[in-house]
C-alpha cells in the first residue's frame, strides 16, 4: 500500500477541500512503516530511487553494543524490550526505533541506529 508523502494540506482555511490539480506522482509516495521487533532475524530488501537497495530490519534478537567505559563494541543478545520514549504506542507494542531501550546480557542498552533504514541494531550501554 502506498502512502502519500508531504505536500500541502488538503483543506482550505474555510474547511473546503482543495481542488486536485493532478494525480499523485510515484516519487511523492511513501512506504508502510517497518515495525522492528525482538525475534529471530528477518530482513526485507527494498529497491529505492536510483536502483539502490535499502535493507529494512523486521526482527532481530542481537544488538551491537558499544561500551563507552571500555571503548569496545560487543554483540549481545536482547533479553527483553523495556521502553520506547519516542512513542507510547510503540512502547506498548514493543517496537524498536532509534532511542528505544532494551535489556541485554550486558545490561540496559539504548538503540542508536535506525533499524527501519539501516537494517542493523546498534546501541550504547546505559550506566
Curated annotation (Swiss-Prot):
Keyword set, alphabetical order: Ribonucleoprotein, Ribosomal protein
**For this chain's UniProt record, which GO biological process terms are given?**
translation
Matches recorded under InterPro entries: Ribosomal_eS8, Ribosomal_eS8_CS, Ribosomal_protein_eS8_arc, Ribosomal_Se8/biogenesis_NSA2
GO MF, one example: structural constituent of ribosome
| Keyword Ribosomal protein listed | yes
What the entry lists under Pfam families is as follows:
Ribosomal_S8e (PF01201)
GO cellular component: a single term: ribosome
Spell out the Gene3D superfamilies in the cross-references.
Answer: 2.40.10.310
Instruction: Give the similarity note.
Output: Belongs to the eukaryotic ribosomal protein eS8 family.
Q: How does it assemble?
A: Part of the 30S ribosomal subunit.
Protein name (database record) = Small ribosomal subunit protein eS8
